[in-house]
């Protein structure tokens, strides 16, 4: 059970919450702050004070005053009208993440909701009632209005949820769990939907997968180095410390550890003086991707604990301030950066695939074919990898450089952060498939070189891989092989745990 405070949630805790189904509870001190902040909202309504989103309309209607008797209807209408999401739903892990992050931001005690609302969100998390949230329709400012409106619907007993492996109406799940829908009161609808939790939840899942994929890329690249009898000197500690990037130094160190007892690597001048960049520059390129990952993690952990709705309430109600913390620009930039960093891992992997299958670049059988000419072997696998990396180049175009005005030009600059976050996740899926192709080719090359000559780590990884796909002894439908390895990498490493050198043993 993880305790939410509004201030301390980490990526590691989100892994447990999203991927292992761990439950949540609220910090009592934080809940007290929620209750105290709510008292401020009640006084604002009682006194008829003009405060945006509490006693006024929204967006362009911010100058329209709302009568006391209409305050509840205002919040209900807000959720109904803003539930304009379209397209396929977010993965269930992402909608679970939205619930967790929305509850966590409310626990900062500046949003003005009743403790009941926070408790309801936590009930959904712990009972695994997850909203069906369409992926498209958010501009990323004022936050993720459309996606979070679909989340808010289920508190009202409306909309759809994922529940016990099925997609059902929210009331089906609430009734089975003995829960009653709630009626939103002043500010609560706005506090539920005005924030960045859709782009951030998708970003968190993307980061978790990206981190593990980056480790996998090092292990697969190490197997390729063996298959091509790469020069180990390029990974010498002195070279990388001379440049000074810690991520580059760390990648080189992990590669050296993986290959320390390999009989397939060569020394400088033994077979050739230098390797091609796709081998020699693995620490420099992969290390740069790790710089991106470290940046993204830092920004996500800030946003996971951020108050992102509007207005915010401070100093016991002395200050009720309309601001713009809902603007998703920080996450939009981070997700666009993640897209570039991960796409490059696929780019360099595809070049290693080419070196494994091109007979002009190695002394392996052409296209790793068992009978070159009669059988094509891995020829079209390289085509598939080339297609994926080209698709990634399109997806990697920054969403955050775009903006379009909305709400009659009141909201005249937006982040497109949710688009960036969604595209980052798509890129990561493509990267994993490219790495799967590289692994299939690297395993085949390793067999040609002699499995007994592989390092302890890569040999173990090879045997695990061969449990998923057999050797290429005849042409067959290789699409199945690629998907099998892809699924194996995702479910055995990127979903469960960080891959380190010893994970393959």
Swiss-Prot record:
CDD domains: PAL-HAL. The keyword Nuclease does not apply. Contains an active site 4-methylidene-imidazol-5-one (MIO), which is formed autocatalytically by cyclization and dehydration of residues Ala-Ser-Gly. Its EC number is 4.3.1.3. Its main location: cytoplasm. GO terms for biological process: L-histidine catabolic process to glutamate and formamide; L-histidine catabolic process to glutamate and formate. It comes from the Bacteria. It is an enzyme of class 4 (lyase). GO terms for cellular component: cytoplasm. There is a cross-link at residues 141-143 (5-imidazolinone (Ala-Gly)). It is found in: Cytoplasm. Keywords: Cytoplasm, Histidine metabolism, Lyase. Pathway: Amino-acid degradation; L-histidine degradation into L-glutamate; N-formimidoyl-L-glutamate from L-histidine: step 1/3. The modification 2,3-didehydroalanine (Ser) is found at residue 142. Pfam families: Lyase_aromatic (PF00221). GO terms for molecular function: histidine ammonia-lyase activity. InterPro entries: Aromatic_Lyase, Fumarase/histidase_N, HutH, L-Aspartase-like, Phe/His_NH3-lyase_AS. It catalyses: L-histidine = trans-urocanate + NH4(+). Belongs to the PAL/histidase family. This is Histidine ammonia-lyase. The lineage of its organism: Bacteria, Bacillati, Bacillota, Bacilli, Bacillales. The gene is hutH.
């Amino acid at each position: 059970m993880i305790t939410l405070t509004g201030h301390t949630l980490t990526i590691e805790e989100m892994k447990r919450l999203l991927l292992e189904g761990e439950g949540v509870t609220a910090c009592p001190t934080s809940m007290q702050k929620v209750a105290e902040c709510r008292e401020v909202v009640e006084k604002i309504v009682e006194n008829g004070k003009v405060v945006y989103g509490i006693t006024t309309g929204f967006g362009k209607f911010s100058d329209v005053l709302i009568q006391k008797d209409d305050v509840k209807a205002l919040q209900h209408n807000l959720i109904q009208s803003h539930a304009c999401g379209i397209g396929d739903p977010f993965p269930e892990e992402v909608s679970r993440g939205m619930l967790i992050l929305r509850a966590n931001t409310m626990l900062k005690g500046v949003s003005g909701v009743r403790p009941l609302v926070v408790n309801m969100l936590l009930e959904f998390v712990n009972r695994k009632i997850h909203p069906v949230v369409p992926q498209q329709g958010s501009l990323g400012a004022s936050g993720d209005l459309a996606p979070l409106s679909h989340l808010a619907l289920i508190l009202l007993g409306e909309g759809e949820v994922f529940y016990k492996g099925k997609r059902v109406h929210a009331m089906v799940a609430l009734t089975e769990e003995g829960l009653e829908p709630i009626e939103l009161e002043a500010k609560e609808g706005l506090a539920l939907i005005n924030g960045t939790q859709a782009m951030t939840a998708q970003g968190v899942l993307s980061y978790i997968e990206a981190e593990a994929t980056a480790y996998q890329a090092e292990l697969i690249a190490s197997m390729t180095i063996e298959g091509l009898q790469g020069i180990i000197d390029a990974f010498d500690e002195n070279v990388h410390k001379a440049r000074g990037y810690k991520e580059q130094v760390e990648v080189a160190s992990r590669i050296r550890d993986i290959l320390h007892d390999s009989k397939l690597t060569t020394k400088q001048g033994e077979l050739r003086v230098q390797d091609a960049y796709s081998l020699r520059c693995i620490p420099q390129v992969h290390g740069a991707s790790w710089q991106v990952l470290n940046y993204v993690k830092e920004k996500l952990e800030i946003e996971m604990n951020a108050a992102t709705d509007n207005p915010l309430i401070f100093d016991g109600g002395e200050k009720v301030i309309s601001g713009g913390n809902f603007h998703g620009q920080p996450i939009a930039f981070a997700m666009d950066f993640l897209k570039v960093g991960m796409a490059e891992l696929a780019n360099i992997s595809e070049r290693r695939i080419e070196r494994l299958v091109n007979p002009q670049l190695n002394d392996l059988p052409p296209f790793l074919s068992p009978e070159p000419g009669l059988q094509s072997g891995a020829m079209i696998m390289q085509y598939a990898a080339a297609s994926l990396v080209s698709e990634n180049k399109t997806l990697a175009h920054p969403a955050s450089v775009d903006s379009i005005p909305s709400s009659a030009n009141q909201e005249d600059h937006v982040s497109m952060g949710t688009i960036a976050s969604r595209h980052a996740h798509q890129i990561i899926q493509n990267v994993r498939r490219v790495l799967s192709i590289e692994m299939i080719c690297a395993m085949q090359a390793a067999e040609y070189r002699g499995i007994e000559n592989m390092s302890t780590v890569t040999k173990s990884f090879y045997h695990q891989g061969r449990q998923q796909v057999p050797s290429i002894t005849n042409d067959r439908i290789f699409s199945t092989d690629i998907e099998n390895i892809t699924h194996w990498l995702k479910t055995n490493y990127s979903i469960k745990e960080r891959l380190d050198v010893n994970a393959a043993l």
